[in-house]
UniProtKB/Swiss-Prot annotation:
Pfam families: RecA, RecA_C. Keywords: ATP-binding, Cytoplasm, DNA damage, DNA recombination, DNA repair, DNA-binding, Nucleotide-binding, SOS response. Residues 1-24 are annotated as: Disordered. This is Protein RecA. It comes from Prochlorococcus marinus (strain SARG / CCMP1375 / SS120). Residues 1-14 have a biased composition (Low complexity). Signal peptide: none annotated. It is found in: Cytoplasm. GO terms for cellular component: cytosol.
Length: 379
């Protein structure tokens, strides 16, 4: 009897070497995670599946077509760059983002390095200019220091810098006209990006940098266009938008707006290289009803046959302008169409950010280990 007890106890005490090694590794991992949290604070390191928010929150751009192209809008807690030629709608696009933030009770700041902000035009786009924080800095260092302090406060939801090209280093301002300061602006931007990026993620503030285009000298093949301020902003930006004017809108001989095309040149939080088009009306900004009509037609909520647009089998307007006028006059139908459009656009978009969880749960259901791809050691 005693021999049987000894054999049972010895078999229970002996564990396979792999399980013993795994237990030691788990214990060591829990110890080091606890040590890191004690040294650097809770939340300094975590498993991705334990995060309270898996999906990146967004700020609406003010254009429904661009929201779709970006996967919801500008991501919170990220750097965004908007660049394009002159009079293409860069400032208008960011003023609409400011208006959207203020509508939701947020705080927005506008760092006007170009000293060209028109408060009357901003108010016509829906910006609450009385509560908008505005700074017109003298130097690039001053502008970026203001941006850094606003981000550190964690009290501002959106900061717009207009523009990177106007962030003049102090050495260039204090020097004489014609002095060469090669790379001074690029060094300034590189240092600023290193300094503010970590604080942006912690505060949840979105920072939008507007940028201008320049031409590279001596480029025969490829695109000669480049943006100012060096390459640092290109790397640190989660989203880069290339905005262009593709058409001038006319009624007879009178010009009343432009048609803008935005290409998502870079996107870390959604699929990139999508394209959005929308109308920008002079004195009014982005045509929200025009965006709604475009998306309703694309999702077959509103159909078009020839010049006639129809909704629920009834003709609502002949031509685009008349249909937009009908949407303005019929607010109930407009709200219903907008609700249907947003439902169509969000179908199937709620997907977990942790791609290993569905794989592991499916494997457990089948009582088989998850299949992992092996990495070949062969050179």
């Amino acid at each position: 009897m005693s021999n049987e007890i000894k054999s049972i106890s010895s078999s229970n005490s002996s564990c396979p070497p792999n399980e013993a090694r795994s237990g030691e590794r788990d214990k060591a991992l829990s110890l080091v995670l606890g040590q890191i949290e004690r040294n650097f604070g809770k939340g300094s390191i975590m498993r991705l599946g334990d995060a309270s928010k898996m999906r990146v929150e967004t700020i609406s751009t003010g254009a429904l077509t661009l929201d779709l192209a970006l996967g919801g809008g500008y991501p919170k807690g990220r750097v965004v760059e908007v660049y394009g030629p002159e009079s293409s709608g860069k400032t208008t696009l960011t003023l609409h983002a400011i208006a959207e933030v203020q509508k939701r009770g947020g705080v927005a700041a506008f760092v006007d390095a170009e000293h060209a902000l028109d408060p009357v035009y901003a108010a016509s786009l829906g910006v609450d200019i009385e509560n908008l924080l505005v700074s017109q800095p003298d130097t690039g260092e001053m502008a970026l220091e203001i941006v850094d302090q606003l981000i550190r406060s964690s009290a501002v939801d959106l900061v717009v810098v207009d523009s990177v090209a106007a962030l003049t280093p102090r050495s260039e301002i204090e020097g004489e006209m014609g002095d060469h300061a090669v790379g001074s602006q690029a060094r300034l931007m590189s240092q600023a990006m290193r300094k503010i990026t970590g604080n942006i993620g912690k505060s949840g503030c979105t920072v939008i940098f507007l940028n201008q285009l320049r031409l590279k000298i001596g480029v025969t093949y490829g695109n000669p266009e480049t943006t100012t301020g060096g390459n640092a902003l290109k790397f640190y930006a989660s989203v880069r938008l290339d905005i262009r004017r593709i058409q001038t809108l006319k009624r007879g001989t009178e010009e009343y707006g432009i048609r803008a095309k935005v290409k998502v040149a870079k996107n870390k939080v959604a699929p990139p290289f999508r394209i959005a088009e929308f109308d920008i009306l002079f004195g009014k900004g982005i045509s929200t009803l025009g965006c709604l009509l475009d998306m309703a037609e694309e999702t077959n909520i509103v159909t078009r046959k020839g010049a006639w647009y129809s909704y629920e089998g009834d003709n609502i307007g002949q031509g685009r302008d008349n249909t937009i006028t009908w949407l303005e006059e019929n607010s109930e139908a407009k709200e219903k169409i907008e609700k249907l459009v947003r439902q169509k656009l969000t179908e199937g978009s709620e997907v977990s950010a942790n791609s290993m969880k569905p794989l592991a749960s499916a494997a457990r259901a089948a009582n088989t280990p998850p299949v992992m791809k092996k990495i070949s050691n062969a050179a």
